[in-house]
Amino acid sequence: MAAGTVCFYLVEGQMEEKAVKILKGNYILSGKVSVLHQRKISNTLLRLIPRKSKVIIVFDTDAADTEHTLYENLNMLQRENIETVLIPQVNNFEDEIIYATSIKNIKELLNSKSNSDFKSDFLKEKNCLKKLEDKDFDIYKFWSRTADKSSSFSKYENRSNKIKKL
């Protein structure tokens, strides 16, 4: 990465925000994190992004109706000459965790009572990184896949290798 370049993560939701925060430094490049919740980048947020930035957009591929918003956000960043790195989550954050660890079901990671309890358990957990590493977390697998060819997101190349400390 060029000297003076700042990473700015725009993520899907709170779980991705926490993931970036726990992975940065050890596994991925450090940077600021903002949650988009599948919304268009506001002018206010755009002004907060430094000129020499690398914007990393982490997005789910299981909601086809959000592809147009992603497309608009990319165009906005390109008009501002801001470098972008796209990271599709196939299909969502939980599926990425399962793929990158030795667990078969997401509730196994934190011994959640149910899959639906996992989100709140993950957000409350103080030792997420250790829990991931205890389940054989593999950064080479995490955020490494591309969307299925039948998905409207398949045209977006996964460039997670640009932010991983390999």
Where are these regions (language model features)?
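Residues immediately flanking
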Residues: G13, T61
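A short, aromatic/hydrophobic, helix- or strand-capping loop or linear motif
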Residues: S34-V35
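Nucleic-acid-processing active sites and adjacent nucleic-acid-binding tracks
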Residues: I41
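Short hydrophobic beta-strand that contains or immediately precedes a catalytic carboxylate
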Residues: F8-E12
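C-terminal accessory helical subdomains adjacent to catalytic cores in phosphodiester-
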Residues: A2-A3, E17-G31, T44-I56, A63-L166
